[in-house]
From Swiss-Prot:
Belongs to the G-protein coupled receptor 1 family. Receptor to interleukin-8, which is a powerful neutrophils chemotactic factor. Binding of IL-8 to the receptor causes activation of neutrophils. This response is mediated via a G-protein that activates a phosphatidylinositol-calcium second messenger system. The chain crosses the membrane at residues 47-67, 77-97, 113-133, 155-175, 210-230, 244-264, 290-310. It comes from Pongo pygmaeus (Bornean orangutan). InterPro entries: CCR1-9-like, Chemokine_CXCR1, Chemokine_CXCR_1/2, GPCR_Rhodpsn, GPCR_Rhodpsn_7TM. Residues 68-76, 134-154, 231-243, 311-351 are cytoplasmic. This is C-X-C chemokine receptor type 1. One of its GO terms (cellular component) is external side of plasma membrane.
Amino acid sequence: MSNITDPQMWDYDGDPNFTGMPPIDEDYRPCRLETETLNKYVVIVTYALVFLLSLLGNSLVMLVILYSRVGRSVTDVYLLNLALADLLFALTLPIWAVSKVNGWIFGTLLCKVVSLLKEVNFYSGILLLACISVDRYLAIVHATRTLTQKRHLVKFVCLSCWGLSMILSLPFFLFRQAYHPKNSSPVCYEVLGNDTAKWRMVLRILPHTFGFIVPLFVMLFCYGFALCTLFKAHMGQKHRAMRVIFAVVLIFLLCWLPYNLVLLADTLMRTQLIKESCERRNDIGWALDATEILGFLHSCLNPIIYAFIGQNFRHGFLKILAMHGLVSKEFLARHHVTSYTSSSVNVSSNL
């Protein structure tokens, strides 16, 4: 998942064609973008698709993992929390979609709550991805199961991820409010008095650092050493794990690297390290909208990366269907699925 900022941060709707961060000065005149309305509705459709796909995919992941109480692995616990984070994030998308059209019409309380929920689940998702990479590193490079299989330790790590996510998200809860500038649509964003612009840069750099750069280096380090170990092993089953690891890193980079590069350029422009112009502002605004879509898409792809790509997940899902009489034992036999009463589901064995 990246940093994911609320849609109103990038598109200021005093007029449907105005773009830019919501100004503190009510006499501010932002740049115009003639095709902003079209872009707005493209984003709305994307929010809807991501919401539906994430709701379905992550719900299925949680269902399969929760059914595997006996054989649940450490990675399964991480995946369960990751699916929950993605699911909770997806639940906020309809509200942001409505705000794209009508501005923020939900008041300050919901502005704070929804912003907190979105940021918490963004941070927790990224931190859990990093934890999964550390777990794979220990299991593959050091063949360490004593540490990673301690359930109470894993639960503590997951709780720590949620707790740290809450701490990192507190500024959004404390300072965000519904704000209605003169002659403009209402917005949900941070209001910090005369220092709002400066603190908004801090709140942008914070998630850029903790939400992408740090987890990325952790993942690259852990998966890099894991891949080296697997290449030396020359084992067929481990080559399958290599493909999954490649998919994890590749999809993460494809989803979040473009957005964070554009976000970095936008931050440099707004801190006057690179020259700001209406043309550049509009280009960056378009790029942020486009690359943000990739970031949102990551919450839909997580079930594919960590679950659907694994044969055991498909078998586990079929076992659940068989337990409820939706498929026959003959169907399971044709698909080489062991009896659903003889073994439990393990989602992550192919990771």
